[in-house]
Amino acid sequence: MKSRSLLSKAVVSSLLLFQVLSVSASDLTSDIQEVIKGKKAQVGVAVLYKDDAFTANNDDQYPLMSVFKFHIALAVLKKMEKEGIPLTAVVTLGPSDIDTKTWSPMYKKYKSKKITLSYGDLINYMVSQSDNNACNWLINFVGGIQNVNDFIKNLGIDRIQLIETEKSMEQDIRKSYNNWSTPLSVTQLLRKVYTEKVLSDEHFAFLEKAMLASASGKDKFRAGLPKD
C-alpha cells in the first residue's frame, strides 16, 4: 500500500531501516560515539533491519516529552475503531477543557473557551501541532493515561512508562521526565504500526498524514530524506 511505504520516511528519526547493512555493529558504534563526542547530551540509538536489531545506549530511560502524543493517537484511533466513531464526528470542548496558558494552536485560532470540532481535527492538532489542550482531552477520551500505557504494553512494547498528562506536566515540569521509553521500544512500536494491522487502513493513512504534516519535524531527520 502506497501510504504505508511513506511512513518509513515519516518516522525515520527513530526507525532506521537500511537497504543494505554494510557496516558492522562495532563500526556503527564507533561512528555514533564520534558524532556525540564532546556533546552535553544523552544519546540513544536503535536500528532495526529485517530480524536484526542494533542499539547504542539503550539501557537508559529517555524522556518522551511530546513524542508520547503518537502513542496517545494510536490508543484514540483504536478506541474509535472499536466504538465505530468516524473521524468526522463532532465534539465540543468547554471551559474546563481549555487551558489558555498552555501551548495550544487550537485555542489561538478559535479564541474561545468553547470549541466545537471533529475528532479528526483534534488528533491533527495534537499530532501535527503538538496542541496540549487537544492532547489532554484525547487522554480523557480513552479513559486516562494509564489506559494509553496499557494499550501500548498490550502491543508487546515493554520498556515504556506513560503516567503523566500535559496537564500534570504543566503543573510540575519535573514530571516531564516520568514518561519515558528506550530507543528500541519506540522503534519497535513504529515498525509494528508500519508492518502490522495495528490500525485500519483509513486510520493508518490518516495518522501518517498527520505525522508528515508536523511542523517541528521538517528541519530534522526528515529534511535529509529524498523528496519521493
Language model feature labels by segment:
Residues 153, 188-228:
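Conserved active-site loop region of the serine DD-peptidase/beta-lactamase
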Residues 1-11:
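Bacterial N-terminal signal peptides that target proteins for export
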Residues 27-58:
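A short, well-structured edge-of-sheet supersecondary motif
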Residues 42, 115, 136-198:
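Mid-domain, small-residue-enriched loop/turn segments at the edges of structured enzyme/sensor domains
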Residues 98-136:
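Conserved catalytic neighborhood of penicillin-recognizing serine enzymes
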Residues 87-104, 142-143:
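Acidic helix-start/capping segments at beta-turn-to-alpha-helix junctions
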Residues 63-93, 126:
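Active-site SXXK
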